[in-house]
């Protein structure tokens, strides 16, 4: 049995069946995770107050160097406004960025008595595919994320607020959203984290989750 499995589960671990929710957003130079460059990555660990309400931790974010031979679609750069080769980006190689990104996530998984992190994203399959493709390319070890399961805030927002677009869902949830700041991995990750916490907390307030149900997660 692993050390994390021996550690008593925190209320957060019990809330999500041993999974630690971590919001991830990426900015890329295209849609193909195998061929197109990863340019930015940001992660926001989700924590829980004593009363069971969720809140986002500060983001951990990196600009990323395009990997050797990466495809870069000009249309994608025009959409995000990112110049991949601007030296002021202080970009890191993929493997270095992911190793640093994963370190605090593994620490939080351990401290909460969780088994794994689970990626939370807005259209999460996209972010998950780029994160895992980059980890595979860089031979990054000890990836803390579940290899295929995710929590998708586009789906959750459609249920809770009747809208799937991040900016509109945030507005409906009462979360300020600046379209001029959008398409930055860090900004979008923070707003996705706020949206996720808003939906889960609202569900709790409506009686959809109580502390009595925590035993079901064991």
Swiss-Prot record:
Swiss-Prot/TrEMBL keywords: Exonuclease, Hydrolase, Magnesium, Metal-binding, Nuclease, tRNA processing
Domain of life: Bacteria
Cofactors demanded by this protein: Mg(2+)
Annotated binding of Mg(2+) 2, by residue: 25, 27, 183, 188
Cofactor note: Binds two Mg(2+) per subunit. The active form of the enzyme binds two Mg(2+) ions in its active site. The first Mg(2+) forms only one salt bridge with the protein.
EC main group: hydrolase
Family to which this protein belongs: Belongs to the RNase T family.
UniProt function note: Trims short 3' overhangs of a variety of RNA species, leaving a one or two nucleotide 3' overhang. Responsible for the end-turnover of tRNA: specifically removes the terminal AMP residue from uncharged tRNA (tRNA-C-C-A). Also appears to be involved in tRNA biosynthesis.
Full protein name: Ribonuclease T
């Amino acid at each position: 049995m692993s050390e994390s499995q021996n550690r008593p589960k925190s209320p957060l671990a019990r809330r999500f069946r041993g999974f630690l929710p971590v919001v991830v957003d990426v900015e890329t130079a295209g849609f193909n995770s195998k061929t197109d460059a990863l340019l930015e990555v940001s992660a926001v660990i989700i924590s829980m107050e004593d009363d069971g309400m969720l809140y986002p931790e500060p983001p951990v974010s990196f600009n990323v160097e395009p990997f050797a031979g990466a495809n870069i679609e000009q249309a994608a750069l025009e959409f995000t406004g990112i110049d991949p080769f601007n030296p002021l980006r202080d970009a890191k190689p993929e493997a270095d960025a992911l190793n640093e990104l994963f370190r605090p996530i593994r620490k939080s998984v351990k401290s909460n008595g969780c088994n794994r992190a689970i990626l939370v994203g807005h259209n999460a399959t996209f972010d998950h595919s780029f994160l895992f493709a980059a980890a595979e390319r860089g031979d990054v070890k000890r990836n803390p994320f579940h290899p295929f399961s995710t929590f998708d805030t586009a789906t959750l927002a459609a249920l809770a607020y009747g809208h799937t677009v991040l900016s509109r869902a945030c507005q409906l949830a009462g979360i300020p959203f600046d379209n001029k700041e959008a398409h930055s991995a860090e900004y979008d990750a923070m707003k996705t984290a706020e949206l996720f916490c808003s939906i889960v907390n609202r569900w709790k307030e409506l009686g959809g989750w109580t502390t009595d149900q925590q035993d079901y997660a064991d």
